[in-house]
């Protein structure tokens, strides 16, 4: 099955690497994180190269529901309890700064950027919602509790986080990637010190940023051993109502909702594979 975002955007193409090169910074991975790293280095005048195994935006980026929000579940109560106020404030500020940067970038990009309120709801625990509201108040966020949502089921409660956003990720990437130093169909096969081997060329870099969805190289931490595969699904429904916001269940196996044009994007069904 294809991605709605692929159907709605033009394709930006880049050549593959076929010779040896040297640069200051190598970015491995051409999703949202990698492209934004390349864009910021480009704006700062730092020599860089981005290597993407397939095509830019062809991984997680094209399959996301494309919400831009500081609200990642009921996380702030947990952050304060586990790590303290200072760390929670740092996390919040980093996300607020990122949202502001997206907003500034999208002013001049046709990527269907829309400001929306974001909601995290719970089906069975009003107490969790109240704890999160108190945590956000401590952090200076004007969040509100909501008891009734325009969803096809009742909820115990929800946290409303105002002025978040949604957009079209591939339209955004297509615009931002113009003029960037990118090689597509350039898979990294081996990394040794400051040298990276691809199928048809070697890249020597002073610094290397791995911006892949998971750590594909067996380096410090052996993170690949700790990973497991999971899968979730998103469908685009026609003739569905406008839910006037972005919604996600606080439970890992719950559902998320947002509109795109006349469509309702419904995500859920998260499960481990294998």
Give the location of each predicted region.
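Helical element adjacent to the flavin cofactor pocket in flavoenzyme catalytic cores
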Residues: 134-136, 158-207, 211
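Dinucleotide-binding Rossmann-like beta1-alpha1 core, especially the glycine-rich loop
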Residues: 71-147
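Helix-loop-beta segment of a Rossmann-like dinucleotide-binding subdomain
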Residues: 110-120, 145-175, 269-272
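Hydrophobic anchor at the start of a short beta-strand
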Residues: 46-48, 143, 208
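Extreme N-terminal leader/targeting segments of oxidoreductases
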Residues: 1-25, 43
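Glycine-rich FAD pyrophosphate-binding loop
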Residues: 43-63
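N-terminal Rossmann-like FAD-binding beta1-loop-alpha1 element of flavoenzymes
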Residues: 21-50
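Active-site substrate-recognition segment that forms the wall
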Residues: 108-114, 202-203, 210-274
């Amino acid at each position: 099955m294809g991605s709605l975002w692929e159907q709605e955007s033009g394709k930006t193409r880049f050549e593959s690497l076929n010779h040896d090169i040297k640069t200051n910074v190598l970015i491995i991975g051409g999703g949202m994180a990698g492209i934004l790293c390349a864009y910021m280095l480009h704006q700062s005048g730092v020599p860089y190269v981005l290597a993407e195994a397939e095509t830019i935006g062809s991984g997680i980026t094209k399959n996301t529901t494309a919400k831009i929000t500081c609200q990642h579940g009921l996380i702030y109560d947990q952050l304060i309890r586990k790590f303290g106020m200072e760390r929670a404030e740092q996390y919040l500020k980093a996300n607020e700064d990122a949202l502001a940067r997206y907003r500034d970038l999208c002013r001049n990009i046709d990527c269907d950027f829309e400001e929306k309120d974001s909601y995290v709801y719970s089906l069975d625990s009003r107490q969790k919602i109240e704890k999160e509201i108190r945590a956000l108040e401590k952090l200076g966020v004007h969040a509100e509790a909501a008891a009734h949502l325009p969803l096809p089921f009742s909820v115990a409660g929800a946290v409303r986080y105002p002025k978040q956003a949604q957009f079209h990720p591939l339209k955004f990437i297509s615009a931002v990637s113009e003029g960037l130093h990118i090689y597509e169909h350039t898979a990294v096969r081996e990394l040794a010190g400051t040298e990276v081997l691809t199928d048809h060329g070697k890249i020597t870099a002073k610094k290397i940023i791995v911006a892949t969805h998971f750590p594909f190289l067996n380096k410090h931490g052996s993170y690949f051993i700790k990973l497991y595969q999971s899968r979730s699904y998103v469908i685009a429904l026609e003739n569905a109502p406008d839910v006037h916001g972005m919604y996600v269940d606080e439970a890992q196996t719950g559902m998320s909702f947002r509109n795109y044009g006349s469509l309702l994007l419904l995500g859920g069904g998260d499960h481990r594979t294998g």
